[in-house]
């Protein structure tokens, strides 16, 4: 399982590396957006998920790097997926976490952090991490 930790770090790094300036795309419904991303990943479509995430955060150049990290899920069977956290902080910031069990792989969490702007919600951060023993990965959620 340590491999996924390296991949999760790389996925985070891919999204914070400076790229050509682009504006984040406002998201009308963070709940629907998060659900869609997890669904795309579970359908073994890492390219589509990477493109959507990278374009939404305003870093289209990060798509190829992110796809490489998401490919770990390409041959995995998503046995169970459910939203486990949806925390809204006074309509200004919001965190959504999905939990998935992947047969033969283990437990994976997908985290989406959204922030409100004058134009609407933006995806400020996306990451994923595995955890076997605890309910949530350490330092992964704001609880």
Task: Indicate where each model-derived feature is located.
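Bacterial N-terminal signal peptides that target proteins for export
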Residues: 1-9
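Short helix/turn-capping signatures at newly exposed starts of structured segments
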Residues: 3, 21-28
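Short, linear, compositionally biased motifs with a strong N-terminal bias
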Residues: 11-14
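N-terminal signal peptide c-region/cleavage motif recognized by signal peptidases
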Residues: 16-19
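Short solvent-exposed beta->alpha transition segments
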Residues: 24-25, 31-35, 47-95, 106
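Conserved short acidic donor-positioning loop in nucleotide-sugar-dependent glycosyltransferases
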Residues: 44
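Exposed beta-sheet edge and beta->alpha loop/turn motif
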Residues: 88-143
């Amino acid at each position: 399982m340590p491999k996924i930790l390296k991949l999760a770090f790389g996925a985070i790094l891919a999204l914070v590396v400076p790229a050509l300036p682009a504006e984040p795309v406002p998201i009308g419904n963070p709940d629907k957006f998060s659900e869609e991303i997890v669904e795309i990943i579970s359908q073994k479509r890492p390219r589509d998920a990477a493109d959507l995430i990278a374009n939404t955060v305003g870093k289209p150049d990060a798509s190829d790097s992110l796809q490489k990290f998401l490919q770990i899920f390409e041959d995995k069977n998503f046995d169970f997926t459910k939203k486990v956290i949806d925390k809204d902080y006074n309509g200004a910031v919001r965190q959504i976490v999905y939990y998935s069990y992947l047969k033969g792989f283990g437990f994976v969490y997908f985290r989406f952090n959204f922030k409100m702007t004058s134009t609407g919600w933006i995806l400020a951060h996306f990451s994923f991490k595995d955890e076997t023993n605890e309910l949530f990965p350490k330092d992964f959620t704001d609880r």
